[in-house]
Amino acid sequence: ADSLRKDSLESNSQNYLKRIEGMTYGDSQVAGILRKNGFYHKDLDIRLISPDNWEVLNTPNSLIFIAPEGKASLQVSVSDQVRKETPKNYLSRLTSGEVYQSKELKLGGHQAFLTLLEENFRISRVAIVFKNKRIFTFYGTTEKNGLDIGEFDNQFLSIIESFRDLKATEIELTEPLLIKSYKVARGDSYSSLARKSPIPFDPESRLRLLNGDYPDGDLEVDAWIKIVE
């Protein structure tokens, strides 16, 4: 009876894996795709890179980069450009705060303005980028209202300065991640599979969750599991 029950469970598991084979994992191409620490958006034609160990949330209205323990965050939003002006002029219309350490520059070949902004007792790292009649606004601050912004500004700048058009070789990275069946080989572990996985932010935990092995379940050789490609 135990043998029959085990065979039945294995059969049900394999049927389930067949049904979910090829299902989308995470975001759609329309929303943009997160792979490892990269964000790729086909329609907007942009790529951004997150600092190591930062989480990235892709919401309907913005992309949010979050530092460990939520101590800082940088939000990226997009709007249509309706006036003929510079990024600096655009920001000056939006805020009456004080800007300093400012500069006009090119980011990924596009007109941009980079500054620190002090407004309503909060210090923020702000960048405005004009690209193809769209305005990309980067707004970074900290849990302490920017009083400790120096601790995170290098990471804010690394995100902002990673902004550029997609390369031809990156177009395939805008395709959504898919769930695939995988037969566990000798020597496999969740740790080794996570190193090869495109899942962004803590792929080992997410693979464990996907397979019901969170937090510390082990893999069995020849077992079929779900991975993401």
Briefly describe each language-model feature range.
Residues 92-137:
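Signature of long, low-cysteine stretches enriched in small and polar/charged residues
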Residues 54, 140-178:
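Surface-exposed amphipathic alpha-helical segments
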Residues 201-229:
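Extracellular LysM carbohydrate-binding repeats and other cell-envelope/extracellular binding modules
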Residues 33-39, 62-63, 107-116:
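Short, hydrophobic/aromatic-rich segments at coil-to-beta transitions
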Residues 170-201, 223:
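Primarily a LysM-type cell-wall glycan-binding module
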Residues 1-45, 169-173:
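Pan-zinc metallopeptidase signature
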Residues 47-93, 117-121:
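Secretory pathway targeting signatures of secreted, lumenal, and periplasmic proteins
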Residues 75-78, 134-146:
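Short, well-ordered beta-strand elements
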